[in-house]
Design a protein with these regions (language model features):
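Conserved MFS/SLC helix-loop-helix module at the cytosolic interface between two early adjacent transmembrane helices
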Residues: 58-97
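Symmetry-related core transmembrane helices of the 12-TM Major Facilitator Superfamily/SLC fold
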Residues: 163-182
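Extracytoplasmic
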Residues: 7-42, 46, 59-63, 148-149
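Intracellular juxtamembrane helix-capping segments at the cytosolic ends
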Residues: 34, 112-126
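Hydrophobic core of transmembrane alpha-helices in multi-pass small-molecule transporters
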Residues: 17, 86, 97-113, 138
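Glycine-rich segments within core transmembrane alpha-helices of 12-TM secondary carriers
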Residues: 128-149
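Flexible cytoplasmic inter-helical loops of multi-pass small-molecule transporters
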Residues: 184-212
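Interfacial helix-cap and linker-helix signal at transmembrane-aqueous boundaries
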Residues: 34-35, 66-67, 147-159, 164
Length: 213
């Protein structure tokens, strides 16, 4: 069981690093090139990103209910597909409305594929024994900015911002999706949802404050 939790932690940690690096940490690098290419102001580019945050907040509770019923694997797998779709749309954007649309799609993926979904997945799998897995996932994904910013910057300077978005989309399909497909299948719905919910809330608070769960 311990080995299974370790494998799950590593797979989710790697998948989370990819998801954060290719979404939350992307505008810091690509906002400038996007604004110059499309004729948008910096503020408008970040306004589009704010739409993603709003959509993500609205999507999160729905994703949580789906994870409660079906387990995290199908939800996280779907998030990789939606991430890839959103990044592809962004790579093809030629006007402001396209950028907003792409980030709205990205918001759907963020709401179903970032920390809250990963935490809910391990709680759904391991119940009160999920705390160490949550800590491990947090430690892995803590490197998302360390990986994402320099990699996005290098790709943008070497190939361009559109190609950078496409490469991140490809990574979701060839790396993130297989990692999530290989996650354990969830068993029957837990009999103590209150305890599970408390564990998720505690984990989220710990991430927000920088403490270990």
């Amino acid at each position: 069981m311990q080995q299974g939790r370790t494998q799950t932690t590593v797979m989710l940690g790697l998948a989370q690093t990819l998801s954060w690096a290719s979404s939350y940490y992307l505008p810091a690098v690509l906002a400038g090139p996007i604004s110059r290419a499309i004729g948008m102001s910096y503020a408008t580019v970040f306004a589009a990103f704010s739409v993603a945050l709003l959509v993500s907040a609205a999507t999160g509770p729905v994703a949580g209910r789906l994870i409660d019923h079906f387990g995290g694997r199908p939800v996280l797998v779907a998030s990789n597909l939606v991430f890839a779709a959103g990044l592809t749309l962004l790579s093809q954007a030629t006007q402001t409305s396209h950028v907003f649309m792409a980030w709205a799609v990205m918001g759907l993926a963020m709401g179903s594929g970032l920390y809250e979904a990963a935490f809910a997945t391990v709680v759904r799998l391991y119940g009160q024994e999920a705390r160490r897995a949550i800590t491990g996932i947090t430690l892995f994904a803590g490197f998302a900015s360390t990986v994402g910013w320099p990699l996005s910057s290098y790709l943008e300077s070497a190939f361009g911002w559109r190609e950078t978005c496409m490469l991140w989309a490809l990574l979701h399909l060839v790396l993130g999706l297989p990692l999530n497909v290989l996650l354990p299948r969830a068993g029957p719905v837990a009999a103590t949802p209150e305890a599970d919910s408390a564990a998720i809330v505690h984990a989220s608070q710990s991430v927000a404050t920088g403490n270990q769960p």
